Amino acid sequence: MTSLHTVSLAELAHRFKTDLTHLEQVSALYPCRISSYYAGLITAPYDPVWKQCVPSVEECDDTVQLPDPLDEERLSPVPGLIHRYPDRAVLLVSNRCATYCRFCMRKRKVGCSGGATDLPAACDYIAATPQLRDIILSGGDPLMLPDDELHQILSDLRRIPHVEIIRIGSRIPVTNPSRITPGLCRMLAEHHPLYLNTHFNHPMELTPEAARAC
């Protein structure tokens, strides 16, 4: 697994000669992390990449923000498993990302301590719920896990006969494409059929590095 290099708000402030100290209250509540690669895509304060990764004071406005906007806690039969629809569930396998998107619907969890997923209990629940045929690995970002840990999770799910579809939701191809290594690809290939869902939000993110990762 490649190491992750990040850029701090202080470094961004120095680079763009702007004061960001007022954002410390936001990052204290909702942590900030920006990969060096993704920070390198920023061309000016408040451009489309900046707005996705640099905190804003509006995040602390309780009149327009909800800590759990999708009501996921109520839909978690065991810690870290979200069972909203009858035939599919979301398994939260990491609470870290290469870059913390400011629009994240799980920012209450990402980058914070506590609330860890009980993976054995989650797999037991899935195994005991035969209508579950589609499992989505999410987080955080599953590709932040070391290859061997992700391999073990995928292997455990593959042993459940009624699990037909496994999907991985990841922004790593967008925010840290060097993580997509030949070794990772070989490991993922062992678990086919496997689907990786990612999303690009702006043309500025469509770089040669991201294209190679995809």
Which residue ranges define each predicted feature?
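Flexible, acidic/Gly-rich N-terminal and inter-domain linker regions that tether
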Residues: 1-84
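Conserved aromatic-histidine-acidic binding/catalytic patches
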Residues: 26, 89, 141-142
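N-terminal pre-triad scaffold of radical SAM enzymes
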Residues: 31-32, 77-106
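Short secondary-structure boundary/capping elements
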Residues: 73-74, 85, 117-118, 149, ...
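Iron-sulfur (Fe-S) cluster-binding segments and ferredoxin-like electron-carrier domains
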Residues: 104-116
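Conserved AdoMet/S-adenosylmethionine-binding subsite of the radical SAM
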Residues: 120-134, 143-214
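Eukaryotic intrinsically disordered, low-complexity regions
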Residues: 136-138
